[in-house]
Amino acid sequence: MRYYLGIDGGGTKTDAALCDEFGRIAARTLGPAGNLVDIGISAYAALLGQLLDGLAQQTGGSLPPVAAAFAGLSGGSDPQIAADCRLLLRNRLPDTPLVAGGDDRQSLLAGGLYGADGCVLISGTGCACTARVNGQQHSIGGWGFLFDGKGGGFDIGRDAVMAALRAYDGRGEPTRLLPLLEAELGCGIEQALPGLYREGKRRIASLAPLVFSAAQEGDAAASGILDENMRELALWLDTAAKYFSGSFPTVVAGGILMKSDDALRRLCGFVKSDTCPARMAMAPVFGAVVAAMLLDGVSEQRLRGMDFSL
């Protein structure tokens, strides 16, 4: 029996799974955020050990021989980060012949398109887009929270705080976001700011669901925030269309687009190119498992027949 390891590390959590050659799940475990840029190599090494130990506990105390392993990380498009990830994996899995680490978009391209051409769009804590054409990958957006202003949970949460502050100090119109945020944060919006600065991206991204709630109540500011962010993601897909000669498949992933029908509806309404964004059918961690299987030469036909179940 051949086994494959996949790891999906995002801005909120890290998911690891071990599957056999038929796609049956042998073990699965969760850990904290796994963006190597944010947590650093030492913390990621400790996290990797925690994940592999958690998997081993579910397989009799030790991992079976692993034919191939792939770790897809938020921030893994940086060649040095990808190299660090591979080294850490190889150190922990010295007998595994095929080990690779890279961008979490590679996991989604594998799990959503099985190595075929198309586009993947992520909107989670952060956001990113990649077009794959004739084996070549082209990045659109996804340059990090300092340089990409719209599209992810952090952006939506930050925009909500900004709208609430404008309502609070009189620069903006009243918005339901102000009382919703104050209730969530447990204090006035001004008093909440030091804590938000300390807690950073993940805490701010966690406020994004309040924007969807306010938009459902008819709040104009909240609806405007969602439109601005989904319009930016639509622009990314329209930019990706330049790499294709006609229609192309698009797979979407990440908490914003996977959990919110409103977000996906708005996105589809703004897209001008010939593509129909569809949610990824499997969890991203199984996309990482598929990426590992592709390393080992498993065919697209076999992969499409797997449902990754217990």
Model-found features: residue ranges?
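Active-site glycine-centered loops adjacent to acidic/histidine catalytic or metal-binding residues
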Residues: 8, 104, 124
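Glycine-rich beta-strand-to-loop/alpha-helix junction loops that act as flexible
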Residues: 70-77, 123-125, 248-259
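Glycine-rich phosphate-binding loop of actin/hexokinase-like ATP-binding domains
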Residues: 116-167, 171
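Short, active-site-adjacent cap segments at secondary-structure transitions
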Residues: 78-79, 107-109, 128-129, 257-260
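ATP-binding/phosphotransfer module of carbohydrate and carboxylate kinases, centering on a glycine-rich
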Residues: 1-64, 91-92, 112-119, 162-310
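Short beta-strand-loop/turn "lid" adjacent to the catalytic site in phosphate-handling enzymes
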Residues: 53-93, 98-100, 112-113
